[in-house]
Amino acid sequence: MENTIMENNVLFGKHLIACGDSFTAGDFTRWTDSEGRAAKESPLVYDSEWGCYKTFPWWIARRNNMKLTNLAKCGGTIAISKEHLADPENVEIGSRHPFALETYKNLGDDVDYILIMYGLNDMYHTNLGTIDDETNETFYGAFNVVYKYLITKYPFAKIGAIVCNAYLSDEYAEAVRETAVKWGIPYLDLMKDTGISTTLNKKGMCDEAREIRNAQFHVNENNKHPNHKAHELMSTYVDDFLRRI
């Protein structure tokens, strides 16, 4: 039976690399579990064996016996920050952990699946740019730089983009879609796809529905990041997405 499950599960034993910001890395600040344990002290939200929060990539990896490398950083962007571009002497180039600076070149050789979800910090801290940009100094350009490199370096890896479903502006969401289409990268649109459940936000939701969902899936009133239930739910449809790309 175990061999049958392994043979029929395309994700089983594969290496998943997750790239993004705090919505992928996990942010449970100002939160405690029912026993008063905070964040990394609580087994409810933190895996001490793997040294990472139990965000949606963790759920996928644990469920399918995958190797997980979570490269997401709280506050992270894909492009170099406009603060650094405006004042390079006083703002470090790596202050926002820009994925398109060096990280995308350092994924190693053992790569099966790559998930990329950026935009929430970029819309405040990076320049949008245009679809024709070929620079890591704009949001559009950073995706172009990263995708060109990844499909060249890893021709047989499965690469997928995610349009985040929380607070992302229309312009930055559209940039994620357009660059994915440009480079032939499949994407999961959490903002517009009506065929999946929502956790925090979705295009067209009424204010009442959004208020109910936010109360259910925010860490708490003082932390608007996804809670552990939101990550578990999100993992189910990202899992399905990975199986289709």
Per-segment meaning from a language model:
Residues 15, 35-132:
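Conserved SGNH/GDSL esterase-like catalytic core that processes O-acyl groups on lipids
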Residues 17, 69, 158-160:
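A structural signal for isolated positions on well-ordered beta-strands in alpha/beta enzyme cores
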